[in-house]
C-alpha cells in the first residue's frame, strides 16, 4: 500500500512523489517505517506526498545543513579515498622505532530477550521480529480520538507508550531534521551506546538514509559480530559515520564472507578488527568480483609474493579498495622515469610501505625528491634512501625533513651522504630521540670531536645506555625529560 504524509505549508511547494522501491520508502521485515525530511514548523497549508510514482525523491539541488548536496542514492566510494587517507598511515609515526600499537551494553528488555530466544529456536528470524503497528498494544481507549490513535505508537519492548511528541523530546534536533518513526527509537537508543549523538544520526541520514530504518535486533546482531572479530567498541562510531551501510550488511551473506577472505590472506585474528575499523568500506566490495581480483593484481602484475600479501594489506588496508591498475602504473612509471628506479626497487617500496600508492605525485613525491636533490643527493642516492625507507615520502618537509637535515649538518657535524648509510635518521624523532641522545653523550663527554656517530641513535634506550652512555636508563630518561621541558619553555617564550 502506498504511504503518504500530510504537512502544512504557507505556500505550496513542489510535490515529490515516491516509488515504492525508492530508498525513502523502504518496506520489509528488516526496516522501520520510512524516515523523511521534516518541513519547517513555521509553515502552514498542506502537501500530500505519495510513495509510489515519481523517482525524483529529493531535489537534486537541495543542500544539507552542512552545505553538502543531498543524494538519495548511496555511493560507496564518494569520499572513501579522502576519509581513508587519514587512517592508512599507521606506521608514519615520527619515531617509527618507537611506534605504539594501535562498554557496557544497555540491559536487554524482556521483549528483546524473548525475541532472541525465539531466533535461536528457529521460531522467528531477527528480520521478522519487528512488530506491525496493528499488533501493538497501544493502550488507547475505544473513545480516544483518531488523532491520538494516529500519534500513539509503542516505543519499544520496555512497555513504554510513545507519541511523536515524545520522540521529539528524546531527540529534538533529529526530529527537527527528520520525520523519524517512533519505532526507530530503539535503534537510536542502541547506537547511542557507541557514542553517537543526534548530529551523528543526521550525518548518517544524509550519507545513507536507510541506515536509520534498520531493525534494532538486526543492527545489534551485526555490530556484535564485528565486536567479536576484534573491532574495538570505540571504533564503531567512526565506522558507522563513514560507512553507515554496515548496519544493512547481513552477517551470513556479507560480514562473515569478508572476514573469511581476510583470514585467507594470512592475516592473524588479532589484526582483523584493526583492518576492518580502518577500511569499513571493504564490506561494500564483492569478495569474488573485486577483492580477490585486487589480490591477484598485486601478485601477478605488481610482483608482490603471495606470502607477503597479508603483510601488505595489514600495512595499508585501503589497498583493497583502490584502483591498483591506475595507482601502481602511474607511480611505477614516475619513479622509473624520475629516478631511474628498476621495477624490483619499486616493488620493494610497495612491500615495505604500500601507503605510497595513495600519495600524490605532485604534492607528495616531487617535493620530497626535489628537497633531497637540493641538499646534494644524486638520483642514485635518493633511490637508495627511498628503497630503504620509503616512508620518507610521507614526512613533512617543514616540520620534519628540513629541521633534521639542519641538525645533521650544524649540530652533528655530518655530511649529507651519511644518509645513504643511515636513512633511518630521517624517520627518528628530533625531539624524542636525536637531540636528547646527542646532548646526553656530549654532557657525559662520551663523544669525540668530529662527526657524531649516527649508529648511537639506532638502538633502544636500554642498549643505548649500556653501549654508549654507560649509565642507567632512568638517568637518561630524567635528562631527556628536563631537556624537553627546557625546549618547551624556550618555544613558549618565543611565541610570547
From Swiss-Prot:
Keyword S-adenosyl-L-methionine annotated: no
Biased composition (Basic and acidic residues): 146-155
Transit peptide (residue range): 1-44
Locations listed in the record: Plastid, Chloroplast
Record keyword Transcription regulation present: yes
Family named by the database record: Belongs to the mTERF family.
Protein name from the UniProt record: Transcription termination factor MTERF9, chloroplastic
Taxonomic source organism: Arabidopsis thaliana (Mouse-ear cress)
Amino acid at each position: 500500500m502506498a504511504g503518504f504524509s500530510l504537512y502544512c505549508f504557507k505556500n505550496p511547494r513542489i510535490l515529490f512523489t515516491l516509488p515504492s522501491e525508492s530508498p525513502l520508502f523502504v518496506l520489509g521485515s528488516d526496516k522501520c517505517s520510512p524516515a523523511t525530511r521534516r518541513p519547517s514548523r513555521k509553515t502552514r497549508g498542506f502537501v500530500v506526498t505519495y510513495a509510489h510514482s515519481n523517482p525524483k525523491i529529493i531535489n537534486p539541488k537541495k543542500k544539507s545543513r552542512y552545505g553538502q548536496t543531498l543524494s538519495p542514492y548511496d555511493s560507496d566510494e564518494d569520499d572513501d579515498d579522502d576519509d581513508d587517507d587519514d587512517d592508512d598511515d599507521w606506521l608514519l609515526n615520527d619515531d617509527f622505532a618507537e611506534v605504539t600499537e594501535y562498554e557496557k551494553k544497555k540491559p536487554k528488555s524482556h521483549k528483546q530477550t524473548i525475541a532472541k530466544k525465539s531466533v535461536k529456536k528457529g521460531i522467528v528470524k531477527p528480520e521478522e521480529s519487528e512488530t506491525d503497528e496493528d499488533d501493538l498494544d497501544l493502550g488507547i481507549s475505544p473513545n480516544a480520538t483518531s488523532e491520538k490513535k494516529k500519534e500513539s505508537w509503542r516505543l519499544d519492548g520496555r512497555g513504554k507508550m510513545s507519541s511523536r511528541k515524545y520522540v521529539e523530546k528524546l531527540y529534538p534536533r533529529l526530529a527537527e531534521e527528520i520525520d523519524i518513526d517512533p519505532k526507530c527509537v530503539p535503534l537510536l537508543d542502541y547506537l547511542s551506546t557507541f557514542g553517537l549523538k543526534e548530529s551523528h544520526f543526521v550525518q548518517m541520514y544524509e550519507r545513507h538514509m536507510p541506515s536509520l530504518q534498520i531493525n534494532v535486533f538486526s543492527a545489534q546482531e551485526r555490530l556484535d559480530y564485528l565486536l567479536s572479530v576484534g573491532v574495538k567498541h570505540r571504533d564503531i562510531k567512526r565506522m558507522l559515520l563513514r560507512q553507515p551501510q554496515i548496519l544493512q550488511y547481513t552477517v551470513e551473506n556479507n560480514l562473515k564472507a569478508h572476514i573469511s577472505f581476510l583470514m585467507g590472506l594470512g592475516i592473524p585474528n588479532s589484526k582483523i578488527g584493526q583492518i576492518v575499523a580502518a577500511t569499513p568500506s571493504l564490506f561494500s566490495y564483492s569478495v569474488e568480483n573485486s577483492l580477490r581480483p585486487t589480490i591477484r593484481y598485486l601478485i601477478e602484475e605488481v610482483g608482490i609474493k603471495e606470502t607477503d600479501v597479508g603483510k601488505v594489506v595489514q600495512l595499508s588496508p585501503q589497498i583493497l579498495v583502490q584502483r591498483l591498475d591506475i595507482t601502481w602504473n602511474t607511480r611505477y612509471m614516475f619513479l622509473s622515469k624520475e629516478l631511474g628506479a628498476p621495477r624490483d626497487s619499486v616493488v620493494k617500496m610497495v612491500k615495505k610501505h604500500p601507503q605510497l600508492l595513495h600519495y600524490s605525485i605532485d604534492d607528495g613525491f616531487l617535493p620530497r625528491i626535489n628537497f633531497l636533490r637540493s641538499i646534494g643527493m644524486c638520483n642514485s642516492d635518493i633511490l637508495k634512501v627511498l628503497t630503504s625507507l620509503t616512508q620518507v615520502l610521507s614526512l613533512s618537509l617543514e616540520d620534519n625533513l628540513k629541521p633534521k637535515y639542519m641538525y645533521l649538518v650544524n649540530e652533528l657535524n655530518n655530511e649529507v651522504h651519511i644518509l645513504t648509510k643511515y636513512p633511518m635518521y630521517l624517520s627518528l624523532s628530533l625531539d624524542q630521540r636525536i637531540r636528547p641522545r646527542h646532548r646526553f653523550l656530549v654532557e657525559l663527554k662520551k663523544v669525540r670531536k668530529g662527526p657524531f656517530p649516527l649508529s648511537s641513535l639506532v638502538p633502544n634506550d636500554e642498549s643505548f645506555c649500556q653501549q654508549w652512555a654507560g649509565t642507567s636508563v632512568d638517568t637518561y630518561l630524567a635528562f631527556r625529560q628536563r631537556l624537553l621541558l627546557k625546549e618547551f619553555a624556550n618555544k613558549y617564550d618565543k611565541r610570547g
